[in-house]
Each structure stands twice: as structure tokens, then as C-alpha cells.
Amino acid sequence: MSKQDVIELEGVVKEALPNAMFIVTLENGHEVLGHISGKLRMNFIRILPGDKVTVELSPYDLSRGRITWRKK
């Protein structure tokens, strides 16, 4: 999948799950299951409930996404 195919949305982390998975509520009200991208995992970026994040969604499965950025 190329970088052009992804859908980037903003959201707020609602709940932290095991194995670095999170339930994220998007701006449009939908909830998706998100996992941390490699760079966030490598640099030990902590994501807690209530954090604003950027999520990349695949057009093939809109219920799962990758957390690529944590807002300040």
C-alpha cells in the first residue's frame, strides 16, 4: 500500500489495551483499534488515555489504524 492510499485522521485515545493497542475516538465520532507505529515504539513514546493522536487508516479496513503521531 502506498503512502497516497492512507487516510489520516485526528483522534483522542479513549482506552489503552495490552500489546500497545489503543481504542481511539476519531473526530467524526467513529472508534477504531489502533497500534503504535515503529518509530513511536522504538523511541519509547508513551501514549496515555486522553492524548490527541494522528491515526492512519487503510481504505480496505476502516476499523483498524496505525498511530503515527502524538500531539503535545
Swiss-Prot record:
Q: Which GO terms describe its molecular function?
A: ribosome binding; rRNA binding; translation initiation factor activity
Q: Which UniProt keywords apply?
A: Cytoplasm, Initiation factor, Protein biosynthesis, RNA-binding, rRNA-binding
Q: Give start and end of each S1-like domain.
A: 1-72
Tell me the superkingdom of the source: Bacteria
GO cellular component terms listed in the entry, alphabetical order = cytosol
Tell where it localizes.
Answer: Cytoplasm
The stretch of residues making up the signal peptide is: none
Pfam families, per the entry: eIF-1a
Keyword Calcium set for record: no
Chief place where the protein resides: cytoplasm
Q: SMART domains of this UniProt entry?
A: S1 (SM00316)
- Looking at the keywords, is Protein biosynthesis present? yes
**PANTHER family for the chain:** TRANSLATION INITIATION FACTOR IF-1, CHLOROPLASTIC (PTHR33370:SF1)
Q: Which family does it belong to?
A: Belongs to the IF-1 family.
Quaternary structure per UniProt?
Component of the 30S ribosomal translation pre-initiation complex which assembles on the 30S ribosome in the order IF-2 and IF-3, IF-1 and N-formylmethionyl-tRNA(fMet); mRNA recruitment can occur at any time during PIC assembly.
Q: What does this protein do?
A: One of the essential components for the initiation of protein synthesis. Stabilizes the binding of IF-2 and IF-3 on the 30S subunit to which N-formylmethionyl-tRNA(fMet) subsequently binds. Helps modulate mRNA selection, yielding the 30S pre-initiation complex (PIC). Upon addition of the 50S ribosomal subunit IF-1, IF-2 and IF-3 are released leaving the mature 70S translation initiation complex.
- Protein name (Swiss-Prot/TrEMBL): Translation initiation factor IF-1
Q: Which organism is it from?
A: Alkaliphilus oremlandii (strain OhILAs)
